[in-house]
UniProtKB/Swiss-Prot annotation:
Annotated GO MF terms: phosphoadenylyl-sulfate reductase (thioredoxin) activity
Similarity comment: Belongs to the PAPS reductase family. CysH subfamily.
Gene source species: Thiocapsa roseopersicina
GO biological process: one example: sulfate assimilation, phosphoadenylyl sulfate reduction by phosphoadenylyl-sulfate reductase (thioredoxin)
Pfam families recorded: PAPS_reduct
EC number: 1.8.4.8
Sorted UniProt keywords: Cytoplasm, Oxidoreductase
Keyword Plastid among record annotations: no
Protein name, per record: Phosphoadenosine 5'-phosphosulfate reductase
PANTHER family according to UniProt: PHOSPHOADENOSINE PHOSPHOSULFATE REDUCTASE
HAMAP family in UniProt: CysH
Annotated function: Catalyzes the formation of sulfite from phosphoadenosine 5'-phosphosulfate (PAPS) using thioredoxin as an electron donor.
Annotated pathway: Sulfur metabolism; hydrogen sulfide biosynthesis; sulfite from sulfate: step 3/3
GO CC annotation: cytoplasm
Gene: cysH
Amino acid sequence: MSKPDLDAFLHGDDAALRETNRRLESMPAEDRVRWALEHLPPQHVLSSSFGTQSAVMLHLVSRQMPEIPVILVDTGYLFPETYRLVDALTDRFGLNLKVYRPALSPAWQEAGLGRLWEQGADGIERYNRLNKIDPMERALRDLDAGTWFAGLRRQQANSRAELPVLRRQDGRIKFHPIIDWHRPRRARYLRRHDLPDHPLRDQGYVSIGDVHTTVPLLPGMLEEETRFFGIKRECGLHR
């Protein structure tokens, strides 16, 4: 595959973007990552929630670029099991972890604004802006991100069903090397490479965010209904 016209990608050449995505669709995830690291603009960064099966993307990308900055947005409300998994995977892979937090601590937010996640759709929207979107935008600016690797998958939600491998977002490139993977395929990858899953996976959690806005998957539920009380699936990071 020839080197893409990066300027065309960033400035609206949709035909070039579609053709590149057509070729990327036929490539294995490992080859997609290799191609992206060779051809897409720096700085390269990888975001991770350290949720279920998160070790897949961390292993897949960091084994080819060990020094890649790994962005974790710590809302202050993550599960204790998530914090322990962050420590374990950072030590195991030698991750270049970059932790970003909200400008206001959880206690300060609750003192002034109350429990935003209990205030309906508008409250959740504001909660996500303060605790997830603003810290991530700060991280991308600080790290001068040109290409953002993320572990989104089409299976996760209807809002992601049509996402391509490669797209533009806010003047940078967003790259989804496992966009077409299903959960069993990720589970096989974990077993093949002897990688740990999130401890809460065994308790029925399939998508893990903050303690107060995440529930296990129950019979009859869709995966996207396990977050934000079913009011929202997307927090706004991956629009």
